[in-house]
Every structure is written in structure tokens, then in C-alpha cells.
Regions:
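Primarily NTPase-proximal linker/entry elements flanking Walker-type ATP/GTP-binding cores
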Residues: 1-135, 143, 147, 175, ...
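Hydrophobic face of alpha-helices
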Residues: 2-5, 47-50, 142, 190-193, ...
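P-loop NTPase motor-domain active sites and their immediate coupling elements
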Residues: 40, 72-105, 110-118, 123-124, ...
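P-loop NTPase switch/communication element
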Residues: 122, 149-192, 327-328
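Walker A/P-loop
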Residues: 138
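Alpha-helical transmembrane segments of multipass membrane proteins
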Residues: 147-148, 286
């Protein structure tokens, strides 16, 4: 390392940059040399020497960090002669992983100093991953998902996976954490994303009814009910004033009576909500099939889903501007770039160059949540056989409870013609037996989105099952049929 430091100093002097190497930080793949230039040296002069130094040092790639944040030094990252593999098992057996208390802990790998790097997906709150073929992107994605599965039970986290390549995520099929079998049909993938948006809206309505703001406080409140510390009838506090939203036709609809207890409080049985991780392995393919619908769903989830406990991981090997649009990029502050083929791809994913100089095979740059400086990490490695062993073990613990209604097509042509919908009869039974009609009540009882529940209520009004909203009753609809 000292010899390399002397050689680096010598080559820099040949280009008119004088100074000395003060510190050396060896890592599993690259070694960082902290170089302190002489006073008066322009940083821009050093930053443009990456390719020249790579040739002079006979190195595969040289990445320059100019300057190092908080220091009057410039960092030179030179590849090691012998790369070290970072096994995922080694990362997961570290004490720091055992003590990691995040809601969605993710193991990433080791930094350039050889220290384990962990993150919490719930704090990110969404992650954008890009990398060219052979960069290690798919293995890195497997590492992230496997680390979550190793830490969290199906009651704590559920997963919805979209795999246009068909083979990349199939190993996870059938584990109890899955909401659905891995989705490979792109048209069904759009339906799955729309369901995630509906589920987000449903959860926010539940939070509003319970007087909470996010999934964490909601689940803590549920725990109090289950432990007997909080009465069920106190779970939903009184709400004053008109609570409304727009239905599918743009009309204002009252969600619940304007005064008094939420009508569902007596019959409502609170349950803890699991976090949901939505994984899209090749986002570019999905955008080619249904760009408009997909982008709108991803943007809504990225903007609002954090507090509801729904988090998105998008991965693509083609980080062009037509795939990672400005709307998507603006809502994914945490991003990971494996090696890309050109500078423009690095600019698209990270907002700056650098990813084109990575070494591949798990070498990556990361923008941590809430930070502006890039962090270089070498991703942990997990083999396909190791992932299969983990998934086989999970399958032995129990069968998945699939929610096949996720992939049922939505009827967006208005309420007409939905009387053949099997949910319609269930909705009629719900309001008839309850003796009142509330869109939020139908939402919760049928586990559907707000728009779907609003359409069912409109159809029941057309069929004479319920009356129109009454302003005197605070928007309450009269049920015109008896209990079933």
C-alpha cells in the first residue's frame, strides 16, 4: 500500500499536482488514498485526471473524490490487486446486524474501509437501483430481499414482486411473506401497482378513523387494544366536522357521519398491519408496456405511501430518462448505482458522474437517505443456492396466504354494469346487516380501495338498496332493505 501511495504521488507530480498521501483506508475491493495537495492547487485540475491516472498506474479504473467532505484532501480510490468477496452470511452474523432495530432492515455490504453497511428501507423510504448487465444488480437485489426475510416474519412484512424477466425472482415464489405469486405478466403488474395504491388509501382511512398518523403509531395502538390496555370502543375516537373525498366521477362524497362515534367502532376488530415491500426487478420493461398507468401509480406510492408502511424497490438495467422520469426520480431520494456503461446513465440515476468508473460485480455507489454525498459500497454476495435454502426453510414454516383479488381488473367505466361483480352481493350484505351505509365501512369489510367502495355504494343507490346521502343526517345513507 505504501508503494502504491508513493507511485500515486509520483504520477500526480508528473501532471503538476504536488502533495502527499496522509491516510490509507484499505477495503475489500478498493483502497482509498487520502491525498493532501499543496496550497493553491485547484481541485478541478485534480478531478479531471481519473483516466490519465488509470493509464499511468495500469489500474482498471480510478475514482477521484474531490474534495473529501469535511477535509482539505482529495480521495483516490484504486482497485486492489486481489478482490475480496463479502459473503452475506458474514454481514448477517455481525453484532451490529443483530442490534439493528429498523422496521425493514436491509444488509448492503461493506464500505471502502471494510465496515458493514446496513440501512432501513422504512427510512429511505423507497429505493431506486440501476446497473448494467454483469454489474451485480440482481445479486444485490437478492441480498436486500434475503436480509429482510432473515429478520422479519410474514406478520411483520409482506412482499409483492414483479419480474418481467420471469426467472430473476422466481426463487421467492411460495414463501409465506408473498401477497401473490411473482407477477410476470406486465398487464397484471399494472393491476398489482394499482392495488398497492388502493391499499395505501385504505390504510390512510384506517389511520384517520383511529386518530393516528402512520403505521407505527397505528400498530402500537392496536397492541394496546389486544393487551386490554385500551377499550375497543375507544380505538376510534370521535371525529367532528364533515369528512369527504372525491369519488371516481369527481363528486364529493361524505366518508362517514359528520358527528359522533365512527359507526364501525363497535364491530371493528383491530389487527396489526404488516409492512408491504413492492419490488419491480426490470422497471424499463414495465414502462414499455404501460408507461402512463405505471408511472402514475409509482409516483403516488413514492409521494404518499411511506406513512402507510408500503415501500417500493425499483430496479432497472437501463437508467435512461424515458425510464427514470423526473417525476419518479424526484420521489426516490435513496438511490443505488452499480456499474453503468456511460456517464449519462450515472447522471440520470445519481445526478452526477462516477458510476461509469465502478468495477462491476457488486461495486456500487449509494446516495443514503438524507445525504448528498455518495457512499461507495461493495455489495455482499449470496449465491442462488443459498437464497434457495433460505426460501425452502421459509416454505416449511407455512403456506402463503395469497390475495388473488389483487389481480382482478378494475371497472373504470362508472358504476353501471357492476351488479355482476361478486363483491356487489357482499357489499349489499355488509350494509344490510349493519343497518347503515358508509363508504369507509364497505372499504374495510371488503378490503378494497376507496374508489371501488364508492362505486359499489353508488350502484347500491341505483339499485334501490340505499338512499342518497342525507344532509340532515350528516351524509348518512338510509338502508332501504332489511338484514340478510
Amino acid at each position: 500500500l505504501r508503494r502504491n501511495a508513493e507511485l500515486l504521488t509520483e504520477k500526480l507530480a508528473a501532471y503538476g499536482v504536488r502533495g502527499r498521501v496522509d491516510e490509507i483506508h484499505p477495503g475489500p475491493v478498493v483502497t482509498m488514498y487520502e491525498f493532501e495537495p499543496q496550497s493553491g492547487t485547484k481541485v478541478s485540475k485534480i478531478a479531471g485526471l481519473a483516466d490519465d491516472l488509470a493509464m499511468a498506474l495500469a489500474a482498471q479504473k480510478v475514482r477521484i473524490v474531490a474534495p473529501i467532505a469535511g477535509k482539505a484532501r482529495v480521495g483516490f480510490e484504486l482497485p486492489n490487486d486481489i478482490r475480496q468477496t463479502v459473503p452475506l452470511r458474514e454481514i448477517l452474523e455481525d453484532r451490529r446486524w443483530e442490534k439493528h432495530g429498523g422496521a425493514l432492515p436491509v444488509a448492503l455490504g461493506k464500505d471502502i474501509g471494510g465496515q458493514p453497511v446496513y440501512a432501513d428501507l422504512s427510512k429511505m423510504p423507497h429505493l431506486l437501483v440501476a446497473g448494467a448487465t454483469g454489474s451485480g444488480k440482481s445479486v444485490g437485489l437478492n441480498v436486500m430481499l434475503t436480509s429482510i426475510l432473515a429478520k422479519k416474519t410474514p406478520d411483520e412484512v409482506r412482499m409483492l414482486m414483479v419480474d418481467p424477466k420471469v426467472v430473476e425472482l422466481q426463487v421467492f415464489d411460495g414463501i409465506p411473506h408473498m401477497l401473490l405469486p411473482v407477477v410476470t405478466d406486465m398487464k397484471k403488474a399494472a393491476l398489482a401497482l394499482r392495488w398497492a395504491v388502493d391499499e395505501m388509501e385504505r390504510r390512510y382511512q384506517m389511520f384517520a378513523d383511529a386518530g393516528t398518523r402512520n403505521i407505527d403509531t397505528y400498530n402500537r395502538r392496536v397492541e394496546r387494544v389486544l393487551s386490554g390496555d385500551l377499550a375497543v370502543d375507544k380505538f376510534m375516537p370521535k371525529r367532528k366536522g364533515k369528512v369527504s373525498a372525491q369519488d371516481a366521477n369527481g363528486q364529493e362524497v361524505l366518508l362517514d357521519p359528520a358527528d359522533g362515534e365512527s359507526p364501525d367502532a363497535e364491530n371493528f376488530e383491530p389487527e396489526k398491519l404488516p409492512y408491504i415491500v413492492v419490488v419491480v426487478d426490470e422497471f424499463a420493461d414495465l414502462m414499455m408496456v404501460a408507461a402512463k398507468d405505471v408511472e402514475a401509480c409509482i409516483a403516488r406510492l413514492a409521494q404518499k405511501a411511506r406513512a402507510s408502511g408500503i415501500h417500493v424497490i425499483l430496479a432497472t438495467q437501463r437508467p435512461s430518462v424515458d425510464v427514470i422520469t423526473g417525476m419518479i426520480k424526484a420521489n426516490f431520494p435513496a438511490r443505488v448505482a452499480f456499474k453503468v456503461s456511460q456517464r449519462q446513465d450515472s447522471m440520470t440515476i445519481l445526478g452526477r458522474s462516477g458510476a461509469e468508473h465502478l468495477l462491476g460485480m457488486g461495486d456500487m455507489l449509494m446516495i443514503p437517505p438524507g445525504a448528498s454525498d455518495l457512499q461507495r459500497v461493495h455489495a455482499a454476495y449470496v449465491s442462488e443456492d443459498e437464497v434457495r435454502v433460505v426460501c425452502d426453510f421459509l416454505r416449511e414454516q407455512g403456506d402463503p396466504e395469497y390475495q388473488q383479488e389483487i389481480l382482478k381488473p378494475r371497472e373504470d367505466d362508472g358504476p353501471g354494469g357492476e351488479s355482476d361483480d361478486p363483491l356487489y352481493d357482499k357489499a349489499v350484505a355488509v350494509v344490510a346487516n349493519a343497518g347503515y351505509c358508509s363508504i369507509s365501512h364497505v372499504q374495510r369489510q371488503l378490503s378494497v380501495g376507496y374508489n371501488k367502495a364508492a362505486k359499489l355504494v353508488e350502484l347500491m343507490e341505483q339499485e334501490g338498496v340505499v338512499g342518497p346521502p342525507s344532509s340532515k343526517a350528516g351524509g348518512r345513507r338510509e338502508v332501504l332493505v332489511g338484514p340478510l
